[in-house]
Amino acid sequence: MAASLIDPSRAPVAFGRRAVPQLFEELQQRPEAARRQRALNSLCDLMHDPERVYQTVTGGFLEQVKVLFQDEDADVRTKTCDLLHVLTSHSVGRQALLSSSLLPPLSQLLDDPSSSCRRSVHRVLKRLTLLPAGADALLTLVPKLMLKLRQEKEEEEVQALILSTLSSCSYQDPRPALANDGVSLLGHILSHRSTNIRRRRPSLMALSVCRDGKEQVCEQNLLPVLVGLLQDEDLEVQVNAVGVIMFTVTITTGKQQCLDLDVLPVLLDFVPKKKEEEEEQDEERRRRRKALVLYSLRALAALAEAPGGRHLLLEQLPVLEARTESEEDQDIRRSAQSAIHVITWTP
């Protein structure tokens, strides 16, 4: 009866604090591939416990996985990356990996022949960008990640992971992505058939923060596509599109292009409090709806700096005033007040 309870995909685990050292010792003995996989599976299970993560980090065991990156067995390489993925779900694990010498050999697995291994590597990299130091450490990989997107050889899940990593890196420093034709590449993704991919455009928003990025958005003629995405059925796609527009209309060319595209009515339509906004129970969707309103108000304030925009918005003041009179959210109230101040300003 007891034998039937043993999981054949896991290695036997020692009791207490001997568990982690024992499994790493087994890996160092270079047993056959099946035993290495079982040991790694058991380690993955243990890494869900913060105490085991701390023991692994402080005990110097992390560096021992480096040799497994070059293992001849693809499943072993994949399981090794899976181990790091679980470990980096903890802040101490992310910090330890960033402080180790594992990043260079780990990044070499981005070209691994196994798609499962490459996917696991991208999951680890995305986890590392949860820390600003992680995003900063991965900036040197931006050109390689951009190339992988451009080649379009990876499956959709991996493309989404790459876009998320690029987004975090670009918020840290947009220059590497901009230098590698990032606006053009990410602009191509705007019309991707997959909603999951279109949602990952915060990376384009990150590039549009700096002036060079704003100018490239205008030069690449991306604003018509972004304005069209304001009508997308997916809320997150709308939020990201408004975010890029919000940054781009702070330059004169962006203002004029958006006014020519008649974007004001669409942005104004996002401002009034809607029934679904009041009834929304999901906290994440409430956050996104708030971002949609805030970004729209800030874009309207920037467009009001142009004479043509101010003239049109003066007729729509009641829409904005309504969000200052009955609005409970202080961020939205202040943004609406700022927009009104710009619209009604006179020399």
Q: What would you call each of these model-derived segments?
A:
Residues 1-347:
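Long amphipathic alpha-helical tracts in eukaryotic proteins
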